[in-house]
Amino acid sequence: MSTEFGVESSAFVAIRAVLSACTVGLLGSLALRWVVLARYAGPDAAQLRGTVAERLPRWIDGLGLVALAATFARLVAQHVAVFGSEEALSRDSLATLLFRSNWGRTWWLAATAAFVVTWVAPRLRRATSAGWLVAAAAILLFAASQPMSGHPAAAQMPNLAVATQLLHLIGAGGWVGSLAMLTLLAIPAARSLEGGSTDSAARIAGLVRAFSPTALVFSALLGITGLYRTWDNLGGFAPLWQSTYGRTLVIKLGFLSVAAATGAYNWRRVLPVLDQPHAGARLRRSSLIELGAALLALISTAVLVATPMSDE
């Protein structure tokens, strides 16, 4: 990674990682509400859905604010990368970035979408369908803006590449993002409801049973689109060890393998005993390992975005 400030610098990688984490978290919020909770068939379903619906907008608002701040940080970072650290922000330099380049159009899309997310999030507590549709559209537009300034935008068929990368992000959000929302929001909400420890364990078990099949579908989408993008980018297996891009991709795949293996462990070993009162601690440990591995894969992705491919 470059020690000088540029698209490969640590600061730029950190900004992209934050943007990716916000994207995955926001998509995961939609998956939690519209997929996982819709499948929930455990005890106190209406009460649990109501509690999550009350708390979820705060998470969406927080993620939207961080995404908006990171989007502006990306503008400053891009300015330094293009014009150098000695060049101060000016009307001409900002106009060049924001109005005379494809990068600028993508930035406007991301900034507008993030702003709409933060604007609509507090209004989601009213539980209106229109508000949630606006939030979903803004989140999807924000997600779509991410690959528009990376390798997919420079592909031979950029529209297909961007669409595939968007599906890849949706897969990540539906799996990892909804797991994060499940762990940080839905399970604590299940514990906070009135009832004894057995009822709490039953609610948590119901949530995980609702989540597990959807995680399989979304992780399959992540894997299929990732395989397609890998082949499209590299054109074979040899570049996996012959190029910096390929070696970084292998590291990312290693982290994803750990996350997938931990998810399989949760499904096969933890899920069958979740009705027991003390199984929650076991689930919490394994879920944190899965999320940690996924976070490292996300950071690897932030590095990949600015890494030249084998044919560049």
Spans of model-derived segments:
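Polytopic transmembrane helical bundles with strong interfacial aromatic enrichment
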Residues: 1-312
